[in-house]
Amino acid sequence: MLLFVQLTFAQMNPFTENLVPVNKLIDGTLTIPENIENPPLVILIQGSGPTDRDGNQMMMKNDASKKIAHQLAENGIASYRFDKRIFKMNKFKIKEADLRFEDFVTDVNSILEYFNADENFDKIILAGHSEGSLIGMLAAQQGADAFISLAGPGRSIDKIVVEQLAKQSEELSENARQAFVEMDKTGSTTNYSPYLESIFRPSVQPYMRSWMKYDPALEIAKLEIPILIINGSFDLQVDSTDAEILNAAAANSKLVILKNMNHIFREIKGESLENTKAYNEPNRPLHPELIPVLTDFIKSIK
């Protein structure tokens, strides 16, 4: 039986939302559709950085995960979205230098275990966004009924970062490439530009090193469950070719590239400026095809 800390009745919406702490590091919101017995449950895994359960960061509010949760509920699908453990690190005196990529996988495994112990949900699906895609792949190997990659990279993070930087500066891109090589060989690096401090500062290097050792294409190939791979054609952070790499590696996958969808699931009809502005526009609707694609896949799982 689930322990609900708080119950909020949605008077105008066909769902209820409950605040559910899984453990001392994981707080989240369980969204349950009304009048649906044993609905499927989607666990939404956030992307990189200090991202909260709704898909927001400081000075960047778009409510991407919140919107997905609510619209899935309108289609009879439950979901659990949660704050990353980053928000609890200060409280429990966890240092940045002690954080590893595997910690986030452990968190998702804890959530899986928590909800697998409940009998209110017919299926449990992991859906990971961006960095959360790889986290979800690794956690799904421990038990899930299906997996959804939302704008998930198909290559290791060092290759993604080097490619992203090349769009801004070839010099910085090459500097990052060399720093990653040194970090991989020796465990750390000091030969990086001050402009790359956010990626290579000493306290974050152990995390980056633990992350870059995973090749998403190799990890998704280990899954024998149904897989949905979604990317947008206007994603400036993760190119649709990454989705194609994942699809080629997966044994049982469906690939969907949504036209003009950006990294946070919005339809962009203008240029790059509109794309960037969308990251801080919570009232901008989700891409119109996203929820139908998700719903069709989830309801097709046997």
Task: Set out the residue ranges of the language-model regions.
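Accessory cap/linker subdomain of secreted extracellular hydrolases
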Residues: 146-218
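Short, surface-exposed "cap/lid" segments of acyl-processing enzymes
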Residues: 36-38, 42-72
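N-terminal cap/lid segment of alpha/beta-hydrolase-fold proteins
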Residues: 11-37
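Catalytic active-site module of serine/aspartate enzymes centered on a nucleophile-bearing elbow/loop
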Residues: 264, 270-302
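Short alpha-helix in the alpha/beta-hydrolase fold that links the catalytic acid
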Residues: 225, 238-249
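Conserved alpha/beta-hydrolase
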Residues: 65-91
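Short beta-strand/loop motif that positions the catalytic acidic residue
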Residues: 223, 229-231
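Alpha/beta-hydrolase active-site loop
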Residues: 96-118
